[in-house]
């Protein structure tokens, strides 16, 4: 027994062996068929579990039996397709009441999946669906599940498109992305998996198409958002046209929350037109608010999708994501881009250079009082208040390119300005790979990361 010194008069014996035993204590949980174990973990909580009997899945990805999975800093659900027995250990969860709820929307998801399968098998033009809804309705969960189901038993490669810059999926935050889902998604990662830049990984890495928006909310610059998504739509359409397997597999599009769109839902309309969406799925419950949302959306999109607007209830077991959780996920995505995670450790390169060696552009924001020429860039001042700890997108455009060329250029990758000395005109920038600093223009994002 060790004794911990505290405030005078407050000495409490602590059983070190007991603490260690509690941390490694294995618990057994049986989840009834058709139910979800809702798991909520903070950044300092680690859950290890192993399926010992039954069939369970996380967002459509089946968990292998007798394989240990590790989770942290995530809110997710484990669905028991049939009665599921799990061995788990997590000292922080030990004293909590576990949340197990019935999956009341499983049949809706299955019906959608089988309808999409029928379309893929009956025509060369695969289904192009977009999921819309308000925050915390399960849009991303439904998209991920449908992608996982599509590749489970057939050699399909559906194109997943993320139009919500808040969600860092296969990219740092502030991006809109598209990626053909050709293999199993990593059930342990909220960001769906790892990309080809992570090197050797246990699961096949994905190669996403990434367009940098740079802001968290669409409202900060709607003109720029529409310009960036238009470029994404063009690239996705070209890929669908040139890849017959992806074309037949179709598109699954995760839209930004309805609250983030303008009153006319013009962002949704442009996505419907740009990606030639033929089915729109709206997540809302059958109550007064849900019917009001459905009516408003249907009036606006009726011209484009007609009767192919489907109402599906809000996904069962969905979590509410507050700002603290969202910031934690964005921070984790930036960290993993440069450093990897506990299973795939990366070694970024910290490079020193003169401030005169870089040219950083920044988009305008209505939150800063900008109201004109919002779809153009301006040169950012090279000072600590602007660039310190900033995430920057490195473009293919040269440093001498003008605003329009930089805005239209594809993204080479991302860098993180870790230090800036204004007196010496020196800075340090973290890059994913070693080598010289590319002589390319950079675009400042609104995201910061401090170790």
From Swiss-Prot:
InterPro entries assigned: Clp1 (IPR028606), Clp1/Grc3 (IPR045116), Clp1_C (IPR010655), Clp1_C_sf (IPR038238), Clp1_N (IPR032324), Clp1_N_sf (IPR038239), CLP1_P (IPR032319), P-loop_NTPase (IPR027417)
Major place of residence: nucleus
Molecular function in Gene Ontology: ATP binding; polynucleotide 5'-hydroxyl-kinase activity
GO cellular component, one term: mRNA cleavage factor complex
Superkingdom of this protein's organism: Eukaryota
Pfam families: Clp1 (PF06807), CLP1_N (PF16573), CLP1_P (PF16575)
Subcellular location: Nucleus
Example of a GO biological process term: tRNA splicing, via endonucleolytic cleavage and ligation
Chain residues that bind ATP: 75, 136-141
Chloroplast found in the keyword field: no
Alphabetical UniProt keywords: ATP-binding, mRNA processing, Nucleotide-binding, Nucleus
Protein family according to the UniProt entry: Belongs to the Clp1 family. Clp1 subfamily.
Function: Required for endonucleolytic cleavage during polyadenylation-dependent pre-mRNA 3'-end formation.
Oligomeric and partner information: Component of a pre-mRNA cleavage factor complex. Interacts directly with PCF11.
Annotated HAMAP family: Clp1
Record's protein name: mRNA cleavage and polyadenylation factor CLP1
Source organism per UniProt: Candida glabrata (strain ATCC 2001 / BCRC 20586 / JCM 3761 / NBRC 0622 / NRRL Y-65 / CBS 138)
Annotated gene: CLP1
